[in-house]
Amino acid sequence: MIFQSFLLGNLVSLCMKIINSVVVVGLYYGFLTTFSIGPSYLFLLRALVMEEGTEKKVSATTGFITGQLMMFISIYYAPLHLALGRPHTITVLALPYLLFHFFWNNHKHFFDYGSTTRNSMRNLSIQCVFLNNLIFQLFNHFILPSSMLARLVNIYLFRCNNKILFVTSGFVGWLIGHILFMKWLGLVLVWIRQNHSIRSNKYIRSNKYLVLELRNSMARIFSILLFITCVYYLGRIPSPILTKKLKEASKTEERVESEEERDVEIETASEMKGTKQEQEGSTEEDPYPSPSLFSEEGWDPDKIDETEEIRVNGKDKIKDKFHSHLTETGYNNINTSNSPIYDYQDSYLNNNNTGNLENLKLQLLDKKNENQDLFWFQKPLVSLLFDYNRWNRPFRYIKNNRFEQAVRTEMSQYFFDTCKSDGKQRISFTYPPSLSTFWKMIKRKIPLLSLQKTLPNELDTQWVSTNKEKSNNLNKEFLNRLEILAKESLSMDILETRTRLCNDDTKKEYVPKMYDPLLNGPYRGTIKKGVSSSIINNTLLENWEKRVRLNRIHTIFLPNMDYQEFEQKAYTIDKKPLSTEIDEFLTLINELGNEPKSSLNLKGLSLFSDQEQRRVNSEKRTKFVKFVFNAIDPNETKSGKKSIGIKEISKKVPRWSHKLITELDQQMGEFQDRASIDHQLRSRKAKRVVIFTDNNATNDPEEEVALISYSQQSDFRRGIIKGSMRAQRRKTFISKLFQANVHSPLFVDRITPLRLFSFDISELIKPIFRNWTGKEGEFKILESREEQTKREEKKEKDKKEDNKRKEQARIAIEEAWDNIPFAQIIRGYMLITQSILRKYILLPSLIIAKNLGRMLFLQLPEWSEDLQEWNREMQIKCTYNGVQLSETEFPKDWLRDGIQIKILFPFCLKPWHISKLYPSRGELMKKQKQKDDFCFLTVWGMEAELPFGSPRKRPSFFEPIFKELEKKIGKLKKKYFLTLKIFKGKTKLFRRVSKETKKWFIKSIGFLKKIKKELSKVNPIVLFRFKEISESNETKKEKDYLISNQIINESFSQIESGNWPNSSLIETKMKDLTDRTSTIKNQIERITKDKKKVTPEIDINPNKTNNIKKLESPKKFFQILQRRNTRVIWKFHYFLKLFIQRLYIDLFLSIINIPRITTQLFLESTNKLIEKFISNNEINQEKITNKKKIHFIFISTIKKSLYNISKKNSHIFCDLSYLSQAYVFYKLSQTQVINLSKFRSVLQYNTTSCFLKTKIKDYFKTLGIFHSELKHKKLQSYRINQWKNWLRWHYQYDLSQIRWSRLMPKKWRTKVNQSCMAKNKNRNLNKWNSYEKDQLIHYKKENDSELYSLSNQKDNFKKCYRYGLLAYKSINYENKSDSFFSRLPFQVKKNLEISYNSNTSKHNFVDMPGNLHINNYLRKVNILDIERNLDRKYFDWKIIHFSLRQKGDIEAWVKIDTNSNPNTKIGINNYQIIDKIEKKGVFYLTTHQNPEKTQKNSKKVFFDWMGMNEKIFNRPILNLEFWFFPEFVLLYNVYKIKPWIIPSKFLLFNLNTNENVIQNKNQKQNFFLPSNKKIKNRSQETKEPPSQRERGSDIENKGNLSPVFSKHQTDLEKDYVESDTKKGQNKKQYKSNTEAELDLFLKRYLLFQLRWNDALNKRMLENIKVYCLLLRLINPTKITISSIQRREMSLDIMLIQANLPLTDLMKKGVLIIEPIRLSVKHNGQFIMYQTIGISLVHKSKHQTNQRYREQRYVDKKNFDEFILQPQTQRINTEKTHFDLLVPENILWSRRRRELRIRSFFNSLNWNVVDRNSVFCNETNVKNWSQFLGERKPLYKDKKKLIKFKFFLWPNYRLEDLACMNRYWFDTNNGSRFSILRIHMYPRLKIN
């Protein structure tokens, strides 16, 4: 068995090896390429089909195979690949050959005249067949294009080692495939010939010569196919001759530019020259080739080779220059005057005045331009046919006004090559292409062995070792610092200090940060100072040295140079003495630096010392000198004249050699210097519309005010350069005339949904359900506000869409007129013809006809009235865009640009004119409408509202006549029928009465007695009572159902609609309520009536005798039964309806009652719990006088929200983060025995974070907290993908102002946001409370339906406080150290009413939405001045006060001016009793104001403190649909904040009482001044704030149980008292709200912008149009008055004065002030805090936020006793906590970056799982505790925090990432951050 399995295993492995072998893969790819059919197959097929002899077949097959072999070889051999893949190859060779072949096949006899020999090889046709098959293999394939195959082959080629074997096997596979293919083809052809059924075909038999004709015309068929191929390729490849040549930028500009660039940096690329002359220019100027060959432009090798070719094909080739002088005799024969290198430079050498250089260059350029005209045909053929500098591809030209030419976009940013890094060969994708080319050239010239000798590995090893050593040193230093810190040493030397450059030691003045090189690196700028002669000499010397070396290198790389020969001649001098010779020679040059070069006498110079001269003979000396002079460029002398300094490092960007202008630029008259040049860019179709011309200077076109009107048509050619190809778009089509994007037909159904198949199921079901229940009326009534608004919105939407459709149609017509040639001329003439016809022929003839008709009907003619109206009609000529001119004046160039004719007061023929004595109201309205009436004339003489609009309906002439006739006929008919009716009725009645009355009277007397008897048996009272009761029950149920549903719908609609207009909010709501109540009443009445009809009742009426008859006579019983049956069948439908209705009501009532019962139980249990806790705590509290049952104010909301959940299927609550903590706590408090340890994490996080376990979820499900959908939604575990989770749960990148106060470790960070009430407020508070109490009690008497009364604000707050205390205690029941609630708020100690720390506490009752994004308006001002802002006022949740609506709906912020109720004062702790005024809203903003200052008529203005341009005062701003306890949600959805931070009062500080604002006004000027206090050695981290020390000492001195307050807080208290009690003597009194708002705005925002109102914009444009018309008129007064009457001109805009104050402009609504969205330049600290602050979300917010704050412990027995921690270790531990959460902060930034990069280079552990083990292994984390030096209770929280810190790169900064990104990945833009795969560096090992 073992042997068998062994064999089997071997077999499998052998098979796998065979399958994966190179040969098999090659064969596979070869077989695949068989199916790529190209044009060459046509020739092969033709040779096989045409039976032209075996020679042709053989030659075709041979050519076919040879061509494919060439293609395969080209895959491996790069030069061949380049040669075949070049665009010139196909352009120059293949296309002409194709055309020639086409001509050859069609004119065969032309070549057949002299062929007599029978030698097959000399026969031209056989060679042609071979060539055809060979050449057409190089063409692209038609079927199964081989691009995919080629890519696969390339990928495999890149992977496999044995490339030649792979290519060979690929070719063999291809060969086998093609042999099989050809054999199969042969067999098919033979079968066709031999098949009898094909030959005996009726059609073929009837056409005897069909096969012969087919065979004869086969050549023609193939030639047609080839011609199609030819056209296809012409379409793909740009024709070299037909494409448009672009005029290049002026040569002189380029020349100067390139000169400057060469001086800046030798290695940068000079401008790419497009044509030969430019190349000549560069070679003549430089004795070495232009460095653009080696430029870092990311070229592919094709482009480099092209430039080589162009350079090689030049007129004077550099190789010839050098080759002619480097002869075997050495340098003896050199003569500078004859040398082409110095042909224009010797005059410069022999000239003392170097200033003639520029003139000389210009002369040379002129000469060159002359030569260019003469010898244009000397251009090389390749660059003529294929100019790579031309825009052949459809590139967009990106215009850049700052530079001369556009940047080339197709240059790749990446270039792959191998390089050595860390001593290993690696592939780099940012390898400089110039270096790669350079290295290839070196390899070509120098033998590989000598290269390998010169490149030892010592350098690499040395580099690696030094890098390791440096990183180890850094690590050691870092660890040493950490260890010292761990020992709790307080010396400040631990932190690495940052050295600053100091100006003055005594004053300690530092250089500004910007210019400090120690902070910002060297300042890169030119140092403009006088240069000493020694510096000039040194730089000259350096430049000479450089140029010697440079030219020496360039001579190596000149084409076709015999390197060995050159080396022999050059190095005939001994190498050792040569170095000394060079040294001495250079010192000599240095001495002679200042002398003119012409005075150098080369023959008489003694270059060397005497000793050296003995060794070196004279021949060697002269040889050396001439070699040096040949290498040195004498041109270098000019460097002495240039300013010496640090040049700015810049990379040369590849640019096009053309500067192009658009059609629009040409039209607008820009680029006047190039006015003669035609535009090269296709721009969007546009028209220049002149709206105003200055009459004084009509000739000057610049005085015209013009607009550009763009065409609406989709133009995909826009921005494409003329002559360039169009993009080859596949699978796209343009179906409409105007289409924004091109779409693939594949997605047509996505773009326009098919009407047949699109339907909404819910919409279909609704009517069925309604019919089934039979409650259509109720459905209509109960249709919520939401649905009503939806319907209205749909109507509006349809209307808008209709208008949009009309507008599109109008634009389409306009575009059509624009596009058709000569259309405007035709249209113009047609319009003028129509206007003349209308005015002088059509209308007068109509007037005549009408009046003649009137005369015929004996009516008075109305000549005067009609003629008056006809005269009133004005036909004004307008420009194409509708700007009015006058009746006689035609617009400029109207035949070309177009014309419109506007008809003012268009004439309308009326059958009669109404008497002017008594006009009706309707006629008056019509007249008013006609005043504004105007229209535009269409081409067909119709009237349109807008130019090119659809013709409008004119009032019919005959319609009023017919109406009048109808009225008269109707009146006559009425009269006639009335008389007839009366006459008939009277006669009938008289006859009938006489007969009937007699009979009926006699019978009725007999039955009266019987009825009496029957009634005495039955008790009628019982029957009636029973009926009444059942009916009343029914109606009650109905009412209940209706009202309950009504409430729900109403609340939803009111909450959800967030954009009601500000002004009429209250009125609309009132109106809605009244409407709704009335409709409900009507509906109930109607339902009761319907029921009466529906239920069949026995009518027991003693007056009627029918029933008695029926009961008495047994004969008629059967008939009665029959009738009853039919009636039952007839009314069964109604019975069914009634039954369903009952069922429906009962179900709904039961559902509605469930939440009521549950909430009652719910609240009772919580009351018991809370009272139990409170009773324990009452010992240390003050005696609370007003003991009552706690009524929570959110009961009504619970009802509603619970019902909403049941109604909405709770799909919203699948995300755990939507559950408010208050709700969770309530649910938990209901359960009797509960294990709270499981839920501590849940209850403490603001979002139920990724740490939530599944068992907790299951437990919650059993408790009924979560719903069943959550069961399947497993949250990702924390370890799977930390990065994703981290981002998912910490997405709040915008820092709010309050988070600033939390994060920045400054003085104000330690302040506790505490609301300190002033002493004098106690009295006012009591007064106000009593007043409110009276009001509430009074109101409660009036309306008993109010659920709960808020009798006392103080008591309510106490309740909420107890609730919060209980919540916190139960959550932190294990961890007593975490408790922060010290005692009840209203214990009077030092008159401070609230003493808990609102900044450190986590309020369960302030639960903000976690998913709202804010626009962050952070400014430098706020950051600098935040300390002062915090000193002003604090705003916590107690400012927002509660009030209950009757139905408990939360609705809006309601603005109440104080003049609405003179008794309602606005004070600190006063909630407005809004219910009395109107039953709206729960939360009301109150403002701080002195009671003395509150006057009866004063108005309060709430300022929108976030700076958002939203008017929030009179409309609802939050959708509370998701919240269970909305009373505890801050009603501000824009300002997002963490739940444990309370917004402070400075956000809503009062305008009138804030003295700080006014006092600080003068100080704000100093915001941007640098502070004078400088510290010489500044620590990287901020030092311990002074406030902390003060507070620490303060605590130590006190030592009692009083709450901890810093000195700042006591100051704050004073500030409160002062600001509130002072009279308003220093306060600025504002005249109006606008002024106050403006003033505050200017204080808040130093920078702002003024924005026009949008509505004003439109009115402005209308005004401008009218002004344009008025300017042209001679007597404009009449038109002015009429235009004002028609409201075409707005006088309020005309009255805007230049010197109007800003407040007036704001009042008028002309200007809107809004803050500028500044991109504030933040320093590194800000970015660090923004990045790191996100990860600081932690369980113990208390500790995270207040690291410097004293921890407090709470005794187990008594929660409210406050015990202080011993003070010994406090300062040290807390300081280290902050620094060591980010241990790297010890080092300063540059060293930190170095540490990271070095650690990165040496990191060996790349495995992701291992790297993340940091987060899972607790022992690793625990190692850090020795650095933290903290107490044990803190440790458990810090551990997780450290985990967070090491979760990312520790304290990584954004700028570091950006730097590393650029450094490693060569990305120069931020969009490629996705490339980043940053590896966290390995953990530091602690010994």
Curated annotation (Swiss-Prot):
Coiled coil (UniProt feature): none
Top-level taxonomic group: Eukaryota
Residue spans of biased composition, Acidic residues class: 256-268
Family annotation (InterPro entries): TIC214
Membrane topology, from the record: Multi-pass membrane protein
Region (Disordered): 248-300, 785-805, 1569-1603
Statement: the UniProt record of this protein carries the keyword Thylakoid: no
UniProt biased composition (Basic and acidic residues): 1578-1597
A Pfam family matched in the record: Ycf1
GO cellular component: chloroplast inner membrane
Protein keywords: Chloroplast, Membrane, Plastid, Plastid inner membrane, Protein transport, Transmembrane, Transmembrane helix, Transport
Segments crossing the lipid bilayer: 18-38, 64-84, 87-107, 124-144, 172-192, 221-241
Location(s) in or outside the cell: Plastid, Chloroplast inner membrane
One of the GO biological process terms: protein transport
Quaternary data: Part of the Tic complex.
Function: Involved in protein precursor import into chloroplasts. May be part of an intermediate translocation complex acting as a protein-conducting channel at the inner envelope.
Family label: Belongs to the TIC214 family.
Name by which UniProt lists this protein: Protein TIC 214
Gene of this entry: TIC214
